[in-house]
A protein has these predicted regions:
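Glycine/serine-rich anion-binding loops at beta->alpha junctions
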Residues: 111-121, 158-160, 240-245, 334-348
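Transmembrane helix boundary and interhelical junction motifs in multipass membrane proteins
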Residues: 161-166, 244-249, 259-261, 278, ...
Length: 383
């Protein structure tokens, strides 16, 4: 396997990550722009205002992508404690002054912009956990560090936000597993996380009722708990092989709530059919594969840990979003990375992909602030 990895030019891996990111972003902008009409009444925005807001976050995300692509390992190391501290403080602020929507308190408003700190926390864990593990490498200290990262996860579960909690947990587990945490510690933490997740579901009436109705009940109210999933399935099914086309999609009539966020893949399935969904899934498989290649080619452990965490992050969110759209997984509010409309999520997704492209191009985070693309390694030449 290592011989196969060695034959792939790191610069090409980086270009593929950048290209896959750009194509998925373009798909998302196109589909969201066609879908947003029925949701404007809920947002209180005009179409122009909504598109300007979407454009603002995309531009901010592209700036984050560029900054993360150029950042060096020493620079990121200096910024990491600040990033983690700010993200935890923002989560605390949500519990005190956050805005509540549909029973969940996940957002804070700053200067007219609504931000979701739990999204920032994903990025913080992805860079802070590897940094802390390398700084305090003893296994005992590593366990304490992981428990400290779970403080933020606890805040997220109390919002409540089951989907983000799952993704943060998977990021942490993948990083700790790759680092080599003892299995008994890892198993104990997984058990605690599982109990906490089940307890969180039990505390959320709407989530508990939705899961019971969909998976354990012989009848599910088509106008209640099963409404979103049913409408999502109807949309995907009506798309057939090649889709109805944008002009005839039922999603434009407002039948499917949150079509531009949680259920964007259903809109793609209805408008462009199985062919469209397959292309989008293929693009994600392409992107995730080369993100994984970036991790495998990284020459230093911190870069590999960041790349593993970022790959699991994007892959888990894509899988959960698609699974919830077809009713395999409970609806948790996880957006489809780069494709769904999202402010904070868009920025941090582009940021972590910028880091992955950086790691791919340099076989690890670049050591200086200057752009330094590697030449073909000796092992690649000999193979």
């Amino acid at each position: 396997m290592s011989d196969v990895v060695a034959t792939i030019d790191p610069r090409r891996v980086s270009r593929y990550i950048i290209g896959g990111t750009g194509i998925l972003l373009a798909v998302g902008v196109s589909v969201v722009s066609m879908t947003i009409g029925p949701s404007l009444g809920d947002t209180g925005l005009s179409l122009l205002s909504f598109l300007l807001r979407e454009g603002f976050f995309i531009v901010l995300g592209l700036i984050a992508f560029g900054a993360c692509y150029q950042i060096s390992a020493p620079q990121l190391s200096r910024l990491t404690p600040l990033i983690f501290t700010v993200s935890v403080m923002a989560l605390l602020a949500v519990s005190l002054i956050g805005s509540s929507v549909n029973g969940s308190q996940r957002w804070i408003s700053i200067a007219g912009l609504t931000l979701q700190p739990s999204e920032i926390y994903k990025f913080a864990v992805c860079v802070a956990l590897p940094w802390a593990l390398m700084r305090y490498s003893a296994s005992y200290h590593a366990g304490i560090i992981w428990l400290a990262s779970l403080v933020g996860l606890g805040f997220i579960m109390l919002q409540p936000d089951l989907g983000t909690s799952i993704v943060v947990g998977l990021i942490s587990v993948s990083i700790m597993w790759t680092w080599g945490l003892e299995r008994r510690i890892l198993g104990g933490a997984l058990l605690v996380g599982l109990v906490g997740g089940l307890g969180s579901i039990a505390m959320m009436d709407y989530q508990r009722k939705r899961i019971i109705d969909i998976y354990f009940s012989s009848w599910c109210d088509p106008l209640g708990a099963c409404y979103q999933v049913n409408q999502s399935r109807i949309g995907i099914g009506s798309g057939g092989l090649f889709g109805t086309g944008p002009a005839h999609a039922r999603s434009l009539w407002g039948f499917l709530p949150n079509a531009h966020t949680d259920f964007i893949i259903s809109v793609i399935g209805e408008m462009f059919g199985l062919v469209g969904v397959t292309l989008v899934v293929g693009l994600f498989a392409f992107l995730i594969y080369f993100c994984g290649q970036a991790a495998m080619q990284a020459r230093d452990l911190p870069s590999r840990l960041i790349a593993i965490g970022g790959t699991v992050w994007i892959g888990a969110e894509a899988l959960i979003n698609i699974a919830q759209a077809v009713g395999i997984f409970p609806v948790t509010g996880i957006p489809l990375p780069l494709v769904s409309y999202g402010g904070t999520a868009m920025v941090v997704n582009l940021g972590i992909l910028g880091l992955l492209a950086n790691i791919a191009a340099n076989q690890g985070l670049r050591r200086t602030g200057k752009l330094s693309l590697p030449r073909k390694s000796a092992s690649a030449k000999s193979s």
